[in-house]
């Protein structure tokens, strides 16, 4: 019986915590991160400030949790790409998935990349980087696979990490422009995005 009660309590806690995060995202969507305060969040979610602190340590922790949830959703989007595709095609597909996520979730996307949240310190080994579980690690493993298969050509000063950085910068730049400065601009962006990403992948390929 105690186990059943505990399970119900845990489910209720998770539901309430998610409701608070949803309310926080609504405030951020309407007025930006600066408008988020424990008082405003309490009014929106029908919790007292003290009640909110039962779930989160403060505003910064709430913003970090919203960002983490956004990153999880971005990663899930990228995982939909078929890893059995030829590696250049797979790299293209995960890039398109990244852009699509930004277009479908602009509030999450902008918050994730405009609010600085604490990051782990200390350098990770290449193997640790490849074993991670995030959108960047999906990209990193795709580049590693391309190098291992002899499709992508690593060069002095432009190896795995540099290739992954260049790929991320390319796709992120496209996504950010489309949800900010170029939102609503009359242009066939899908065609332009396709050409940009395919040309980038070709630039990584060896001459063999």
Please describe what each predicted stretch is:
Residues 112-116:
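Short, flexible, mixed-charge acidic loops at enzyme active sites
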């Amino acid at each position: 019986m105690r186990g059943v009660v505990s399970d119900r309590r845990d489910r209720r806690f998770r539901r309430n915590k998610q409701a608070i995060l949803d309310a926080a995202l609504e405030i951020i969507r309407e007025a930006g991160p600066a408008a988020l305060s424990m008082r405003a969040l309490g009014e929106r979610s029908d919790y007292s400030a003290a009640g909110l602190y039962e779930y989160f340590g403060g505003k910064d922790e709430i913003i970090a949790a919203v960002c983490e949830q956004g990153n999880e959703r971005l990663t899930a989007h990228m995982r939909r790409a078929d890893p059995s595709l030829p590696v250049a095609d797979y790299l293209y597909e995960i890039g398109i998935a990244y852009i699509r996520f930004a277009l479908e979730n602009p509030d999450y996307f902008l918050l994730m990349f405009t609010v600085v949240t604490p990051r782990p310190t200390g350098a990770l080994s290449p193997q640790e980087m490849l074993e991670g579980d995030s959108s960047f690690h999906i990209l990193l493993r795709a580049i590693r696979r391309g190098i291992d298969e002899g499709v992508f050509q690593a060069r002095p000063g432009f190896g795995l990490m540099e290739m992954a950085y260049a790929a991320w910068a390319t796709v992120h730049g496209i996504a950010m422009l489309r949800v900010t400065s170029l939102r609503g601009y009359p242009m066939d962006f899908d065609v332009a995005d396709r050409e940009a990403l395919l040309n980038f992948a070709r630039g990584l390929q060896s001459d063999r």
